[in-house]
């Protein structure tokens, strides 16, 4: 603990309404209704079910604490009356500045709105009660003998501001009784990090699904860490892989053991299968991972491989054109790759590397093995139409055997091309050459470029953005592929098990919409660094950290992913970065560890059983030269009641589904149509809920009702209309295309944060925030606040986390003490704005705490993103009009304001207006 004195910064403290009503979170079973009207459970397995339900009930009770603010009544006085704060650590209290436009008598309209909660446009506060229409009571219509999630309706207007802590709650539980498991335990049917279903109670027929207006889909994330050593899943290593003879489903915790353990009945197709004798060779079969876990890895026997496991192979294509030399990208990439050689996956010591440099010609390097000397030769190939390999050997070399010479080459690359003034970049020819080089093994082609592909096959051209910006033709003109090569080449890559990853860093147009297809259909990814300059340490840090983590993530090759559903279910749609090889098979040349996928499910016949099952199987070759199968299996109850469908809906997974559908339709339908797609989807659900779930027909003056487990979903859908990918207004084409690309691949937690940014109030954060927890040692983060300007004080300090970037907003009327403690200068006009880092100030603990919060937010081992910090200065009446940074500051303020998604962005509604519009629509 630092010896520095703590400070207190100005903040408003007011009385709020008493008698706060705690909303109830949906997706659980209240204790008072468990087993109501049901027979007593007597068997041990059924007793275990009681315990499971009790735990779920207790969890729901605990969740309630997160849905309302915890308020100390003694900390508030009369509403609207500022009070003196207690001393903070003995330090002198910072007074509020009383200059014009900021004093108590001259406060801004936004601040007045925040200081008077009883007059908020969001309607009644939590303490106020309102007569509500009748609705289905919890427990009504429950299936006898089968516990289900229950419905807890809420008024969305009463839930304003929306309780954002709901975004971190788990989904409604999968209510599967223990007798449906071979070995009941907590690791069976508990894999929401890997697999989430939009509906945790599946409608028994397609008509009920259509009636609900909710989608049935899965959000899949096969790997949750970048490396296998982090959180490994249970593994069956004896080579015994048991599958159903008919449907080919894998043995899982939900099969039925029959005939005294000699056979098992498949839970997908109901076929009886024999157990192989080998299943008992290593002891008790019921201790095997596949009986005890929903997520399990199998080391596959040789029958699962069509050829010996190939070595991990990387072909790096480096842009050496004038733009790449000028902005320092080549030097940065070469240095980063050099520093990452130790972390490139090489578990079996067979990893191979090739380096090709490109401008208007192709520059190959023949790298000798270290034992053969250090004479590295460069071959220049100018034939772009039919590029050829200039040497039969030495172009693709083992990392471990040519390490010294690879280091020598990477060190010398910037010097070799430092005088290059060629403006052209033959991307397509380089890609074809790299594919020709590694086609025998498969692997990855990683492109680092700073220039639009402008010569040879696959030439792209700048598009006239100004002519179509913010018009109905914008999407079709700017987002469609500019050349057919970028759709045909990925097909060739899939034939040879090759993935393409793109790292584009430029301050000019590079046509992300076209080149992103290279990764989209090969299981790869496109990363974009607009305005990159090696002279800016912030740019270098972001690129280096992300590029290094990308090449260091474990590499899995020759992968195929298949989804199975039990009788009556079929896969109808697939979304994500892969090649859809057949109706239910997705091919990934390599498996990315930081992406997720969405599979849509259809109901093609009446579901007659009480439970259905879904299984994801991913067959791949690991970097350790093992053929492995990752199997993920869950069981889901079925229902013929619409109330139970709604009570079990997962609002985050549903949002991911609609985001994928919107990404798919935007290029052809346009952005206005896509925004209306979000609005209409919410309207249909609210209308269905009002008509089919509420037991009385209510008039236009009634509340806007929805179940509590879906109460954040309208906010997320509304926020999507303001996302850079879909919003109206002028958005650069490359930025919009990259935003669509991110929505298509982000893992669910990062997707939600990218849709609804997390906002932290730092100037008034609790004493423990920003310091290590006494028990865990982890840095404590302050509680987030709603993403709205109505909560931002003009003298405050706020951090906005979008999942990809961070914005540190300092109010224009912040007192000099706060500015000094954070930035080391009392003059707010001297704060460095834009991409930057906070200075290290030894004289103030508050600076350390803020830096700790930023560092903690940047910590993650499941994606490669490094969040750039943008420092933004708020407006102030004393700000000079002709300040040199005025234009940059105005742009930063607009960008920051666009992250406050509960407010108006461009011509969109704020959230309350959106709900009012929905209410009007469904009342017609």
Curated annotation (Swiss-Prot):
Main location, first listed in the record: cytoplasm
Keyword Repeat (UniProt): no
One Pfam entry name: Gelsolin
Region named Zinc finger-like: 244-269
Membrane topology summary: Peripheral membrane protein
Residue stretches spanning the membrane: none
Gene3D superfamilies listed in its UniProt record: beta-sandwich domain of Sec23/24, Sec23/Sec24 helical domain, Severin, von Willebrand factor, type A domain, Zn-finger domain of Sec23/24
Any GO molecular function: zinc ion binding
Residues the entry annotates as binding Zn(2+): 244, 247, 266, 269
GO biological process, one term: intracellular protein transport
Assembly notes: The COPII coat is composed of at least 5 proteins: the SEC23/24 complex, the SEC13/31 complex, and the protein SAR1. Golgi apparatus membrane; Peripheral membrane protein; Cytoplasmic side.
Family listed: Belongs to the SEC23/SEC24 family. SEC24 subfamily.
Physiological role: Component of the coat protein complex II (COPII) which promotes the formation of transport vesicles from the endoplasmic reticulum (ER). The coat has two main functions, the physical deformation of the endoplasmic reticulum membrane into vesicles and the selection of cargo molecules.
UniProt protein name: Protein transport protein SEC24
This protein's encoding gene: SEC24
